[in-house]
Regions:
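Short, solvent-exposed loop/turn segments enriched in Ser/Thr/Gly
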Residues: 195, 312, 662-669, 710-712, ...
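N-terminal domain-start motif of subtilase-like serine proteases
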Residues: 45-64, 119, 128-130, 141-151, ...
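Terminal connector regions
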Residues: 720-749
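Subtilisin-like serine protease catalytic core
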Residues: 46, 60-67, 82-84, 184-307, ...
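Beta-sheet-dominated interaction scaffolds and their linkers
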Residues: 528-534, 638-675, 698-701, 718-721
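Structured lumen-facing ectodomains of secretory-pathway proteins
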Residues: 202, 211-214, 218-220, 231, ...
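Hydrolase catalytic cores
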Residues: 262-266, 270, 274, 298, ...
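Inhibitory N-terminal propeptides of secreted protease zymogens
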Residues: 45-168
Length: 749
């Protein structure tokens, strides 16, 4: 099955925090840059309180499949999709209705029949979980029983090894990028942003002692689960791990990932923040500051991964507990078109439960989106940059540059020495072999193909007193990690951004000072795609993913009290894990302002109104990224989302694959729903077609009454011999003073 990574912290190189769920294990991957090359790694990474994260370089994945356990899908539709029990759009399943009770009993009987069969035919196997909301299924510990034996049982539809998943890591710059404050103001202001909406954070737990989650001023709530870890802001605290009893774990936030995610999603309005002794010059807020949160801990204690059944248990419990949205900043390997965890996400969406999910941190590269982010009806997040970090000042002449620390030594008092530029011909040297001309100086070298440890060690051997490494990709400097080899270098070392390269190379020989006192730096590096952000299309069926991009690099948020000397604690993390709660919080704001909208309509409002033409390439920071399998529909704009006039289902148009040698015409129906209070005619058109040999057309207009739905048909024609590769276009919709757009995609094989 799949393996999901948590997109979390990087407090030491290659440190990982994994999250496990029922049939897949989910991981929170904490990654710090270790290599010189600016290639993205997976998972969410935290630089620690003072370390910024720009592009993760490397991380180690754990196993993607647990072959000792399986999910078994049985015949019979689950409650979320069965025609007599599935809720109407905008509603939830009524568990108290006689129809639902009766059908649940029928499904239970089917599962009991399976358990009886198991006792007779596979007595060593043990049922460890049962499901009826998202799937009619059971989780089974095989205990040596062959998977093929389970497949012979009556009523079995599919037997799938459990996947392993891992965590994937107001002038508030996050909120400014997505126009959150303007969206709040339209709906009554910050005091009502997300009020009454419940979001389940399926992660490592939430530290309720943090001021981000202080419940002062919140009305009394029914608190669920372990009330040692709940209040009237975080209203549920439960553990989901099949070894929880043996491990003696609780919902307590021992790891930092979940608290960081929860802060981005719903931190109380205007919470003062300090990072490593540096006062942040704005008071942070979550995207939905009045939202109610649930701690559904699938990575309890020091547990590093979760299986599919853990995640399924958490999803069904959150739905049953009355939550509206879940946030899954985790990921794992995909099981393709038959992935049961993605099916569960899709089914729950149809039952009114919105799932915001990380795309993964396995980019750059196509086909790297992970499960359950690959689910068709998941709100899947890619990651882009936030333009700020905390670092040390490097002063050369009249100019000061921000530099980032990492695992290497830092100065304890101001250090002044000549800047010694190391050249390899006319280029800045990567210092992957012996260097010269730096004795007594601060060596300026380039990020490149060898590890940071190697290049810094070479500079130290040549007599350098400190090292400044120039990044080779766009964005703010990243935290540098050691490579784990013996005899690590001992001199101070920092990274500076690529944008500062020319100025520093031109200052060769000038006196330079590295300051010991850290500072907050605001930069111009916004809206750069993260190199690590996983890319589509999905495997097997070749659909557009991610759906939309949100801030996910250098995201400031809360972490538990045990992670700093003087709580409350805050840190900058990076990863699609950090982008995901921006989407979950946005969904809460949209749902709060439009409570009758269905899960699909809320998703569409966010995806199909995103800003286009704003995201830049991570390698240069100059060219605009248009590839829909990198950016989806663009970077989210919450103000546009709450003002959406039309909803699309699905949110993108994917024609799958077409052989290059054939001539084919395919059609794709999109359901349009008029979200306004009056009749409207919506005009449709196709623009921005790429490649040769593939053309698109669409129904020119659709007229809909207030709240009504209708169908628009997109037609794709691929000429014989069409150029191989990815072909895309944009479907534009306008009407009633609003507009929307959707990605259109075909893969010519």
């Amino acid at each position: 099955m799949k393996t999901h990574r948590r997109l979390n912290r990087a407090s030491s190189i290659l440190s990982q925090v994994r999250i496990a769920t029922a049939s897949t294990l989910f991981i929170l991957a904490a990654t710090m840059a270790v290599l010189g090359a600016g290639k993205g790694g997976g998972g969410s990474t935290s630089t620690g309180p003072a370390r910024p994260n720009a592009n993760a370089d490397a991380f180690t994945k754990g196993p993607t499949v647990d072959t000792s356990s399986v999910l078994v899908q049985l015949k019979g539709d689950p409650l979320s999709t069965y025609v007599r029990t599935k809720p109407a759009p905008g509603k939830k399943i009524d568990f108290n209705s006689d129809t639902v009770k009766s059908y649940r009993a029928q499904l239970s009987a089917l599962r009991n029949d399976f358990k009886q069969w198991l006792q007779t035919n596979a007595p060593k196997a043990k049922v460890t979980g049962q499901y009826d909301i998202s799937l009619n299924a059971v989780a089974v510990q095989l205990n040596g029983t062959p998977k093929s034996t389970i497949e012979q049982a009556p009523q079995v539809v599919l037997v799938q090894y459990q996947g392993i998943y891992y965590p994937t890591d107001n002038n508030d710059p996050d909120l400014a990028l997505i126009s959150a404050i303007a969206a709040w103001n339209q709906g009554g202001g910050a005091a009502t942003a997300g009020a009454g909406v419940k979001v389940a954070v399926i992660d490592t737990g939430i530290d309720i002692t943090h001021p981000c989650f202080d419940d002062t001023g919140y009305p009394a709530q029914t608190q669920l689960g372990d009330q040692n870890f709940t209040n009237n802001k975080v209203i549920a605290a439960k553990v989901f791990n099949n070894k929880a009893g043996k491990l003696g774990v609780t919902p307590e936030a021992i790891q930092d990932h979940g608290t960081h995610v929860a802060g981005t999603l719903g931190c109380n309005l205007d919470t003062p923040a300090t990072v490593d002794g540096v006062d942040i010059p704005y008071d942070m807020s979550g995207v939905a500051p009045r939202v109610l949160l649930g701690n559904y801990n699938v990575f309890p204690g020091e547990v590093e991964s979760a299986r599919s059944e853990d995640i399924l248990n958490a999803l069904e419990a959150a739905y049953t507990d009355g939550f509206d949205i879940d946030n899954m900043s985790l990921g794992g390997g995909s099981s393709g078109a038959q992935d049961l965890l993605t099916k569960a996400v899709d089914d729950l969406d149809q039952a009114g439960f919105i799932s915001a999910v990380a795309a993964g941190n396995s980019g750059p590269g196509s086909f790297t989106v992970e499960s359950p982010g690959a689910a068709a009806r998941a709100l899947t997040a890619g990651a882009s940059t936030v333009p700020h970090f905390v670092g040390a000042p490097l002063t050369v002449g009249a100019s000061t540059f921000g530099v980032a620390s990492g695992d290497f030594a830092t100065v304890t008092s101001d250090l002044t020495a000549p800047l010694a530029v190391v050249l390899d011909g006319s280029n800045l040297s990567q210092a992957c072999s012996a260097v010269s001309g730096v004795s007594g100086g601060i060596a300026l070298i380039s990020r490149g193909t060898c590890t940071f440890s190697t290049k810094i060690r070479n500079a130290q051997a040549a007599g350098a007193v400190a090292v400044i490494v120039v990044n080779n990709v766009a964005g703010d400097p990243t935290a540098m990690g050691q490579d784990g080899t013996p005899n690590q270098p001992t001199i101070p070392a920092y990274m500076v951004s690529l944008a500062n390269k020319a100025a520093l190379v031109g200052a060769n020989g000038q006196s330079a000072t590295i300051g010991a006192a850290l500072a907050y730096f605001s930069t111009t590096n916004a809206d750069i795609m993260a190199g690590f952000s996983s890319q589509g299309p999905t495997d097997v069926d070749f659909r557009v993913k991610p759906d939309v991009v949100a801030p996910g690099v250098n995201v400031l948020s809360s972490i538990p009290a045990s992670f700093c000397d003087t709580p409350p604690c805050f840190a900058f993390f990076q990863g699609t894990s950090m982008a995901t709660p921006h989407l979950a919080g946005s969904a809460a704001v949209v749902k709060g302002q439009h409570p009758t909208w269905s899960a699909a309509q809320v998703r569409s409002a966010i995806v199909n109104t995103a800003d286009q033409g704003v995201l830049r390439d991570f390698q240069t920071g100059l060219s605009t990224v248009t590839n829909v399998n990198i950016i989806g529909s663009g970077r989210e704009n919450l103000l546009s989302a709450v003002n959406a006039k039309v909803a699309l289902d699905p949110v993108s148009v994917s024609f799958g694959s077409v052989p290059s040698g054939s001539s084919q015409t395919k059609t794709f129906n999109v359901t349009l729903t008029n979200l306004t209070g009056a009749a409207a005619t919506f005009s449709l058109s196709i623009a921005n077609t790429t490649g040769t040999g593939v053309t698109y057309s669409v129904t020119p207009s659709v007229s809909l009454g207030a709240g009504a739905s209708g169908t628009a048909t997109v037609t794709m024609t691929a000429a014989k011999g069409s150029s191989r590769g990815f072909h895309q276009a944009t479907l534009n919709i306008s009407g009633r003073g609003g507009s929307a757009h959707a990605a259109v995609f075909t893969f010519i094989k």
